[in-house]
Amino acid sequence: MLFRSFADVGAQLGGGVDDDKASFKLRTLSSARERDKALDLYIKILQKPDFPGDVLAREKARVIAGLKEAATQPETIADKAYTKALFGSHPYGFDAEPENIEKIDRYDVQKFYSTHYGAQGAVIALIGDMSREQAEQFAEKISLDLPRADKPAPLAAVSYPVAASEQRISHPATQAHILMGYPGMKRGDPDFFPLYVGNYILGGGGFVSRLVKEVREKRGLAYSVYSYVSPGRQVGPYVAGMQTQKSQADLAVDVMKKTISEFVDHGPTDEEMIAAKNNLINGFPLRIDSNRKILENVASIAWNDLPLDTLDTWRDQLKAVTKEQVNAALKAHLDMNRMVTVVVGAP
């Protein structure tokens, strides 16, 4: 019924939750009549949710069923074990279990809403056919009757692993799923762009990356191997991963570790730096080629307290990255002596 009401005025409602925040997205037509109706519905949902008992029960059942199904999948098992090994008791290391969801009642949801969905902690980003004055009016209208709760306290700092660890979990899957990595960095870290370039060379650049050359091209251990850094308000994970035949799992782990270690020790070549920077600079327009992508970038800038000219200076920041900066960033954010490794499905 709710989504039909949005569809009737040509609007779409979306949202999501990650380790740091919940988000609610509204996409609407620019015409005043449809826009205002959609905005009124959106505001009603945000400011006066009633959390009906029957809907809560239905959603709990849906989430529990999804969790139980996911818990049988090797990629989910690997991800949960890796996250727990990396972050321990920190909130970033928590994954919901069916019994956690089962205990939630309507009072819990209402209390969480009243303490975490206040105007003080909200970030509102708007893009489209509107004046600045209109945007300010819309933002004021959206935030006006949100709960008057204090801004939630920031999460505690992440504790780093004290030693390297390797966890092996049996599973009947035909392939072994491998994850390894280390806590990476916060989004506002000065090393963001050097590590961004370094990761592109190591495993973020697809078929031109070091990991693909060593794992796939030279040894045929996997079709795909990758790495990425996922910075949050606190230090997020740096992850390298792949799938391979079970009989090759030991070799694959060894090759990944050696490739990452060599890259951290010696850094990229001049040729790799030139190619990576050119690809990232030339690919920047694809990050902002739609209103949706621009909105996501603007919201991220506001949420992470980044400079307002972040998008304007993005390419210049990439151009300015030196090989020495990449080398220093890799050594500062990847400690091979404390690397976490998880293998699901190994013999």
Question: For each predicted feature, which ranges?
Answer:
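M16 family metallopeptidases and their MPP-like homologs
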Residues: M1-I45, K60, I64, P74-E99, ...
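An aromatic/glycine/proline-enriched structural segment found at the starts
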Residues: Y92-G93, A119, V123-G188, V343-P347
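Mature hydrolase/peptidase catalytic cores and their serpin-fold inhibitory cores, especially
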Residues: D316, Q325-A328
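Short, charged, amphipathic alpha-helices and their helix-cap/turn boundaries
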Residues: I101-D105
